[in-house]
Curated annotation (Swiss-Prot):
It comes from Rattus norvegicus (Rat). Interacts with GNAI1, GNAI2 and GNAI3; the interactions are GDP-dependent. Regulates G protein-coupled receptor signaling cascades. Inhibits signal transduction by increasing the GTPase activity of G protein alpha subunits, thereby driving them into their inactive GDP-bound form. PROSITE patterns: GOLOCO (PS50877), PDZ (PS50106), PID (PS01179), RBD (PS50898), RGS (PS50132). It is found in: Nucleus; Cytoplasm; Cell projection, Dendrite; Synapse. There is a cross-link at K195 (Glycyl lysine isopeptide (Lys-Gly) (interchain with G-Cter in SUMO2)). Residues 962-1032, 1034-1104 form the RBD domain. GO terms for biological process: negative regulation of G protein-coupled receptor signaling pathway; regulation of G protein-coupled receptor signaling pathway; signal transduction; termination of G protein-coupled receptor signaling pathway. Residues 409-428, 442-488, 620-650, 842-934, 1103-1168, 1224-1325, 1349-1387 are annotated as: Disordered. This is Regulator of G-protein signaling 12.
């Protein structure tokens, strides 16, 4: 490793001060020391285990001579150049300092882990300088010191040294990197800075004095995963030993290896290639990590020229002691590992199983519409791997530089220059070149290779042949042989053209290969004073930007937009390069302005920047202003520092940046034709607004303030950070009637910042939020599920995070629903256009609502006070059609106008005010606090706007994907395919079946709506809609006094007493005189407990006073006949029959024996309290005939009045349809039909409680997921064997019953116990027919009765009937239609 005579090991202690001569071989990462000061220069640090350490150099030693040149009084710059020009053994005369730093102090700089290669050095804040800054940046950028370097005899300045493996230190001195490329001892460049200017640039620049002393900022956990991609492993082949012609031989061997394995058609083994920050791991689905390639052993990678699917990784073999293995002095052992990328696995559906097998979740790539883990080509993989490349020496760099060239170009040796620029602190990531070269796959396009016949790298064309090299060399090297910038401009332009066709990742930012390239020896001349402008200088501006940005490591990668993203030819992976990293940049974290104009000018002057980028300016003029100084001084270190700082952060943040919500992927609000790239060149998220193709200057995104509107499309989080964005988003939500969501989110955000110790303020704000948004009487209720409900006791002990769950739900609702539509809305488009054109943002009130806005009225809220019943009279079809083109203001006006008509449904609005009862409480399975989920719950008439909005957006829905989103009770969501010809019932039956949900125990609602949907509608009308399943409680109720049992479905949040009172009242019983207990228990049941506690239970009602049961029974016998006639007298009556009443509303069901006339009286709610106090006994004296007649009169008057004023009163509404008229001889049926049961939804059921074969449910009374045992009126009772269908006139199989004692039934007959099935079903059929016009119009029909979901009769029978006849058996619906249901997928 070292020359004879060199000390073999470190001296044990500091040597006495003396002058001695040492020879230091260039090691793996350089010489291993850093310099400071001048005249003479002093060694400020010596890396432990480095060549300098081995020869006994210590910190504090003074350099007196270098290669027989006296430098005792030379400037720092001159010493740096001399050291940098020497690529072989460095001969120095040093004077040992009197105060040597203890050898262990080099630990601060980092050391060697035995067998592990170089560790990242730690920073020494006492020695911060250009050297330290460069080293640190380089360290952070690359992630570790690599163990490989190839040297050629011709690389040495003298040209006489044999090829050896030498070590280079990681911690190069700044001076060594300052190697400006011109031998100042010979011919100073006229534009070079003076020594004073150079010193001022270095000393004044904050980057060298601030922020680099904290090694924690740069140290990264090596286990951080950068990316994981699934590739196929074919095999590994050891490459033959090579000599001086390593580049050609290695490249040919690699290609031969890949061709051989490909020709053998070896079956590849799928492995996950994990690119870590310091290694590449191969992981199988069973055995775990099977191979690991440390970064220091990676030489380079290449794509197979014959088949781009194949690529190879070349690794160097090392000995156990960490040194590279050497078979002899001139050869190294290398291996090529060949992999392939299978494009057939690109599509997500195809590789889902593979992803599950490997145990990871796919990350969507919005640009390729695929997944990052399954690339379509090998380029993304190579781009990630290339980040790990280290400085392996110029020979390996030559191999890398040619790795992508076509075979025809192999004859032209890629004679890269020697790495004289690597002045000891080296490990100046040569991968910079390879990174860029690897990505820029020029194929056979690059034919201007230098014709260097010598194997000794004598032509700059190795990299100069690649178009970017010549201009650099021409600029830096004042040599007649070196091409001038003008001469190489055509090459550069040609390269740019090539990269255009290669995709955005190929856009040149800085000449990749030549960032470190020096002029080859042949052009340097024998004197060694060549113009090898070793651009080792670390750009001050680059360092400053890197340092400033690194403070926020999570976002530091965002600055990659300025040079380390797509334009940088592969320094970052395709997803990162295609999605501007700036999208997640917090303003101010990067984009620091240059230090000053003076410093920028100095830097340009120092490094020949005035004419450096001449050929490139017209290509990257949009980046010129921001990056001129950075690119001008653009050395590989600068790029690697910026790039890998970004890369590393990207490694951590990859999931955050790429697994983005749907709204980010759909944020293309402006087409390419509307906004050009020039218009959006500074837009933070321009690729969200127009395609990359139209944005040649995508990477110049910078000024957030100037493009704030465009930044709103970056992410929903970004939108919420901008007060102006929040204001416009709030205006948008206001038009969609969902402003309460953003208000709630803001209130919760403010609440979370209240100090935890301020209990008074917390309590006040908590109750304010609760009363305004969450309670049952909230003025602006928000839509959250039952799991997020708050109990009263929580409000008594508030804490800042108590609303976190609710806030997150609303946040997600806005993000995945409202935000996406906002980006597509006309309001946002107007804002974007105004910003691009330089105008002030438009007034949100002047911008009309977009179609998306109209559409969202139904999906977000049914909060307009619209008429309650669409189905009662066929009015819905006509009224909705007439309103199709109306504006929101018209809808509001109509809603307010029609809100009074809600009273026709038993004074519902008044009741709502008093009781805060809302259908959306269905989700509250745990009996939590009730709350309304939409503003429309103030009235139960929101479905008009739902249908209107649905119809107005019918065209858009037809174009959209045919699916809908269903939110399940457990908080998850499913995307359900909808298909024309399949009913909602069929679709949801399959959904419930797949998820193990009891279809009978749920109801289906529109998100934001409070009415169940009618399940017989065609499922296609649900396309693109958001739905939710609300839980219900199923239980059996045994009425012992009358020997009856009923199966009930109730809203889980209702108290037991609210549910049982209307049921027992319907059967003429008084709940107060009955004992309620659970089967098998003797203790009375707590009637105040939530009904959810009875789910699946059997509840028994027993008499406390036996005489009361007899009175009730006698009372029942006379009622059915008259009640039946009342039912049939009104064609609208069935509308009310589906209503289910809660506490205080039981009068609507207590038609017999109670104040029936108040069932539709608006003043009912006021009388309920008195009813509860006075008791049922008093009301039993009321004449039931009069009550029924009054009930019908009220119903007719209110219904006709509403229809008449709306212009919807029709003749058929005034006459009972034929199919509802009782046929002659069907008096028995009339006698057996009691009055309509309010508080129950009506469904035809068989004698076993299941739906009849010819079931036609009332359009508004079906429950989601097709209840297996559809509910009927609670007064309907079937004896075994009695089948029933929608109307006796049309149902040959319907059985007609004769009057009989309650609770009894004869075979084939229905018991006379309340049994209004026939009339109910006739009304149902009529209702269904009336709905058809609206269905044809594309509207979504909902159950219009307000309380329809509160209580539903599932089945009825004798008290001895088995449960299966009363309640549907879980978990699968039994009435699922036959046709196959479209599948669902959980996300």
């Amino acid at each position: 490793m070292y020359r004879a005579g060199e000390p073999g090991k470190r001296q044990s202690g500091p040597a006495p001060p003396r002058v001695r001569s040492v020879e230091v071989a260039r090691g793996r990462a350089g010489y291993g020391f850093t310099l400071s000061g001048q005249a003479p220069c002093v060694l400020s640090c010596v890396m432990r285990g480095s060549p300098a350490d081995f020869v006994g150099l210590r910190a504090g030693d003074q350099i007196l001579a270098i290669n027989e040149i006296n430098v005792k009084k030379a400037s720092h710059e001159d010493v740096v150049k001399l050291i940098g020009k020497c690529s072989g053994v460095l001969r120095m005369v040093i004077s040992e300092g009197s105060s040597h730093v203890e050898p262990s102090s080099s630990d601060e700089e980092g050391g060697l882990c035995e067998g592990k290669g170089w560790l990242r050095p730690k920073l020494d804040s006492k020695a911060l300088g250009i050297n330290r800054a460069e080293r640190v940046v380089e360290e952070v950028q690359s992630g570790g010191i690599f163990n490989m370097i190839f040297e050629s005899p011709s690389l040495c300045a003298s040209g006489s040294e044999p090829l050896k493996l030498k070590q280079r230190s990681l911690s190069e001195s700044a001076a060594l990197r300052l190697d400006v490329g011109q031998d100042s001892l010979c011919t100073p460049h006229p534009s070079m800075l003076s020594k004073e200017e150079i010193s001022k640039v270095i000393n004044d620049d904050s980057v060298f004095t601030v922020g680099l002393d904290n090694h924690d900022d740069f140290g990264l956990d090596a286990s951080i995963l950068n990316v994981a991609m699934v590739v196929g492993y074919l095999g590994s082949i050891e490459l033959p030993s090579t000599s001086s012609n390593l580049e050609h031989d290695s490249l040919q061997a690699i290609r031969g290896c890949m061709r051989r394995l490909r020709a053998e058609q070896k079956i590849h083994s799928l492995v996950t290639m994990k690119v870590m920050h310091d290694c590449v791991q191969l992981v199988t689905d069973r055995a775990g990590v099977v191979a690991e390639y440390p970064a220091e052993k990676l030489a380079f990678s290449a794509v197979c020229p014959d088949d781009r699917r194949f690529f190879g990784l070349v690794t160097m073999q090392t000995n156990d002691d960490g040194c590279l293995a050497q078979e002899d002095e001139g050869a190294l052992r290398t291996s090529c590992h060949v992999f392939m990328v299978d494009p057939d696995l690109f599509h997500h559906k195809i590789h889902q199983g593979i992803a599950r097998r490997f145990g990871f979740a796919c990350t969507a790539d919005p640009d390729t519409s695929g997944c990052l883990e399954f690339p379509a080509s090998s380029l993304p993989v190579l781009q990630f791997i290339s980040v790990l490349y280290r400085d392996m020496g110029e020979l390996i760099e030559g191999v890398r530089a040619r790795a992508f060239l076509d075979g025809d170009a192999d004859a032209h040796q890629n004679n890269s220059t020697s790495s004289n620029s690597d002045s000891g602190i080296g490990n100046f990531n040569q991968e910079e070149k390879s990174n860029r070269v690897l990505v820029v796959d020029l194929g056979g396009g690059s034919s201007r290779h230098g014709q260097g016949s010598s194997p000794g790298w004598e032509s700059v064309s190795g990299r100069g042949s690649q178009p970017w090299s010549a201009p650099w060399n021409g600029t830096f090297c004042h040599d007649s042989e070196a091409g001038s910038p003008l001469e190489t401009s055509p090459n550069t332009d040609r390269f740019w053209d090539l990269t255009k066709h290669s995709g955005p990742v190929f856009h040149m930012e800085v000449p990749p290969a030549t960032l470190r390239s020096s002029i080859p020896p042949s052009k340097r001349g024998a004197t060694g004073s060549s113009c090898g402008f070793n651009q080792r200088w670390l750009p001050v501006h680059v360092l400053q930007e890197w340092q400033c940005g690194h403070a926020s490591d999570q976002e530091s990668y965002t600055d990659s937009t300025d040079g380390w993203s797509s334009v940088n030819c592969g320094t970052l992976p395709p997803p990162m390069s295609k999605i501007p990293a700036d999208r997640y940049r917090v303003e101010g974290s990067f984009a620091q302005a240059p230090l000053s104009t003076q410093k920028r000018d100095w830097s340009r002057k120092a490094f020949g920047m005035q004419n450096l980028f001449g050929p490139h300016r017209n290509v990257r003029k949009t980046k010129e202003d921001k990056k001129s100084s950075k690119l001008g001084r653009g050395v590989a270190l600068a790029q690697t520092s910026q790039r890998t700082s970004a890369r590393r952060s990207f490694g951590r943040s990859r999931r955050f940046s790429l697994t983005r919500s749907l709204d980010d992927l759909e944020s293309a609000t402006v087409s390419d034709g509307e906004l050009t790239g020039a218009d959006l060149k500074d837009c933070i998220s321009n690729n969200s607004l127009s395609s990359n193709a139209s944005l040649p200057s995508v990477q110049s995104c910078r000024r957030l303030r100037e493009r704030r509107v465009a930044s709103w499309a970056v992410s929903f989080e970004r939108l919420l950070q901008d007060p102006v964005g929040v204001r416009y988003f709030s205006d948008f939500l206001r038009k969609e009637f969902s402003e309460e969501n953003i208000l709630f989110w803001q209130a919760c955000e403010c609440f979370s910042h209240v100090p935890a110790h301020d209990k008074k303020e917390l309590s006040y704000r908590a109750r304010e939020i609760f009363s305004k948004f969450l309670c049952s009487k909230a003025t602006t209720p928000v839509n959250i599920d039952s799991q997020a409900q708050l109990a009263d006791d929580i409000l008594n002990a508030p804490h800042p995070d108590m609303f976190k769950e609710q806030q997150l739900q609303i946040f997600n609702l806005m993000k995945f629903d409202s935000y996406t539509r906002f980006l597509k809305s006309q309001l946002y488009q107007e804002c974007v256009l105004a910003e691009v054109e330089g105008r002030t943002l438009p007034d949100s009130q002047q911008v009309p609502s977009s179609p998306a806005s109209k559409h969202s009225i139904s999906s977000d809220h049914s909060n307009v006070s619209t008429p309650k019943k669409l189905s009662g009279k066929s009015k819905s079809g006509r009224s909705l059609n007439e309103d199709v083109g109306e504006e929101d203001s018209e809808k509001k006006r109509k809603g307010a106008f029609f809100s009074w008509s809600r009273s026709r449904s038993t004074g519902r609005s008044q009741k709502k005010k008093d009781h805060g009862d809302h259908a959306h409480d269905a989700l509250h399975a745990n009996g939590g606090l009730c709350r309304r989920e939409s503003q429309g719950s103030v009235s139960s008439a929101g479905s008009l706007d739902l249908s209107e909005a649905c119809r107005t957006s019918a065209l858009e829905r037809d174009k959209a994907a045919k699916h809908c989103c269903v939110h399940l009770p457990d908080g998850t969501s499913c995307v359900v395919a909808v298909k024309s010809g399949f009913s909602i019932k069929e679709i949801l039956s399959g959904l419930c079946e797949r998820h193990g949900i009891n279809g009978a125990a749920v109801d289906l609602f529109l998100v934001g709506g409070d009415k169940p949907l009618v399940l017989h509608q065609d499922s296609s009308i649900l396309a693109t809609r958001d739905l939710r399943l609300g839980k219900r409680t199923l239980f059996r109720l045994d009425l012992v006094p009358i020997n009856r049992s009923v199966g009930l479905k109730a809203k889980p949040t209702k108290p037991v007493t609210e549910v049982l009172r209307p049921v027992v009242a319907k059967y003429g019983l008084d709940l107060g005189s009955l004992l309620v207990r659970l089967s098998g228990e003797k203790e009375p049941l707590d009637l105040g407990a939530p009904i959810s506690s009875l789910d699946g239970q059997r509840v028994i009602l027993e008499e406390r006073d036996p005489s009361r049961g007899k009175v009730s029974t006698e009372k029942q016998k006379g009622a059915p006949v008259k009640q039946s006639s009342a039912v049939n007298s009104s064609p609208r009556n069935h509308s009310a029959m589906g209503e289910e009443r809660t506490l205080g509303k039981s009068n609507s069901i207590k038609i017999r024996g109670e104040n029936g006339k108040s069932a539709r009286d608006p003043r009912l709610s006021k009388r309920e309290e008195s009813i509860a106090k006075i008791g049922k006994k008093k009301y039993q004296k009321i004449n039931l005939d009069e009550a029924e007649e009054f009930f019908e009169l009220i119903s007719k008057a209110q219904s006709n009045r509403a229809d008449d004023q709306r212009g919807l009163l029709r003749k058929e509404d005034l006459v009972l349809p034929e199919f509802l008229r009782l046929p002659p001889g069907s008096s028995e049926l009339a006698l057996s039909s009691p009055p309509p049961v309010k508080g129950f939804s009506k469904r035809a059921v068989t004698s076993h409680g299941q739906e009849g074969a010819v079931q036609t449910e009332e359009s508004y009374s079906d429950s989601p997921a097709t209840s297996p045992a559809s509910a009927q009126s609670p007064c309907s009772a079937y004896s075994p064997g009695s089948a029933h269908s929608p109307g006796s006139a049309h149902s040959p199989g319907s059985a007609h019953s004769t009057p009989g004692p309650p609770g009894t039934a004869q075979p084939g007959e229905k018991p006379t116990k309340p049994s209004c099935i026939s009339t109910v079903q006739e009304g149902t059929t009529q209702a269904w027919r009336r709905l058809s016009p609206e269905l044809e119009a594309g509207g979504i029909q909902t159950v219009e009765e307000e309380q329809v979901a509160d209580l539903t009769l599932m089945g009825e029978g004798d008290i001895s009937s088995p449960n299966s006849t009363l309640l549907p058996p879980p978990p699968l619906p039994q009435d699922t239609p036959g046709p196959t249901r479209p599948g669902t997928s959980r996300f």
